[in-house]
Amino acid sequence: MSLLQNIKRGVQQRPQRVIIYGPEGVGKSTLAAGLPAPLFLDTEEGTQHMNVDRIQVDHYGAMLEALQDIYKEARNGNLPYKTLVIDTGDRLWDMCARQVIRDYNASPKDGKISSIESIGYGKGYAQASEMFVNLLSVFDNCRSAGLHIAVICHCRVETVNPPEGEAYTMYTIKINAPAKQAITAKEKLKEWGDAILFCNYVTTFTDGGKAKGGELRAVYTEHRATWEAKNRHGMPAVMAMDAGEISRLLFGAGCGPANAPANGAPAANNGQAPPPAASAGDRQADALAAVIDHAKDALAFMISRGIITAGQGLEEVPAEYAARILKTPARFNNSVKEFMEGGACR
């Protein structure tokens, strides 16, 4: 039989592998809790304040056991969940490091150790990274049984020294090891993910040009010099932290509402309806606010151009024009700046 007879055409829907990372307290776990029918594997008791279904795991063996049980139940159609959430990936690496120490101490050659660094020549870190990568394969087993996989990670700021230019800093996924030793695990995790979503607080600017943090948060889905991100789903470059819309784009229209367990299992919110998803206008306003330097000046600029009328806000900017802003925010901000300075606008 010719292999050409096996050609298939069209989009193939498969469970997705998603990495959600960002600074402490930005809402990563809350965002993951809004993905379709989530079950958390909580490695650091970070979900205690949340009304979610969870399995507490505190060491490598417990993680493997939990994953094996989940795989069996999912394969047999007995698991009332659609998304497996690992909270967090960096603590998962810590589990691997502690397991390396346990294995070494089980038959010590030169006495027992308490630190992975005591295993010379970086061998301990290499073994921990190998264990970490092995867990990614176990996650894929669960994925083959129909589960989406979401891995939550913290972030760290690293210095990048490109050979062709000046050094700069960027947000990157945190692995609790020295940067050089963490490369293998981190790069494998990035390759493994179908989407990497960077969550962060939006920096705005005062009239004096000073940067100011705020409560507004955004999800960044495309790689930039200052952060790691990717997606294979045509997602907007900047999005509001709206789990419903993110689920629709990642998992498809049939993913179901946030926090709705599969197969009629009881809802994690005790039967209460999930909070309503943000409107399209609200999502657009959040996305625009994330890339516009001065919202007040931008509104004045768009009013002068007849894009919007006085009294309207970012949520009422025509979708086509909003898409242009999001595609080339620097150009738009320059035009606004020239307008405010009285110069010719592009």
Predicted regions located by residue number:
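Hydrophobic/aromatic ligand-binding patch that stacks against planar heteroaromatic rings
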Residues: 30-32, 141, 188-189
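Conserved nucleotide-binding/hydrolysis micro-motifs of P-loop NTPases
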Residues: 44-48, 90-91, 155-160, 202-205, ...
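Interfaces that engage single-stranded nucleic acids at replication/repair/recombination sites
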Residues: 5, 11-14, 26, 34-35, ...
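Short, well-ordered beta-strand core segments
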Residues: 38-40, 149, 196-198
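Conserved GTP-binding G-domain of TRAFAC-class P-loop NTPases and closely related GTPase folds
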Residues: 161-278, 282
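P-loop NTPase motor core
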Residues: 91-184
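Conserved P-loop
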Residues: 2, 6-86, 90-98, 274-286
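Amphipathic alpha-helical transducer elements in NTP-driven molecular machines
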Residues: 57-68, 78, 83, 121-136, ...
